[in-house]
């Protein structure tokens, strides 16, 4: 919820799904909870044909109360708006600048607080950077105090939605230094 700077990533592109599933993010992972949101059209099918669901562990009061509280706090504290602002003012510009400074950065893509920096051996062919060098970038970040999510040849920047602009900028600077050390 809110990671891209909108409640759901699909909101950025005007997508109107028939069904959305969700889980731990709805209550910040405090208590296991998942759910489904359906369109009015899909919901209408149950007007005359009941859904044979509703098991003994459904509708758990503690889990749903924690979700209501988490969503209320996210709304009141404008967490989603903050994620959008972080992407627009700090993460996006900072990470995109890495393209100009490091030949091993082949692409930077993202929105809000959900970014990926693609590491390449060659920008033209997009040949992935060797795993050992990707690991060296990760290790450089960890040594400086940031634990990035690394998948294949991508360094993902997915900070907490409540991170400050200064701390987000520090994370970008740590990645910048780690990239410089590797090449």
Which sequence ranges carry the predicted segments?
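Conserved N-terminal phosphate-binding loop of PLP-dependent enzymes in the Aspartate aminotransferase
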Residues: 1-183
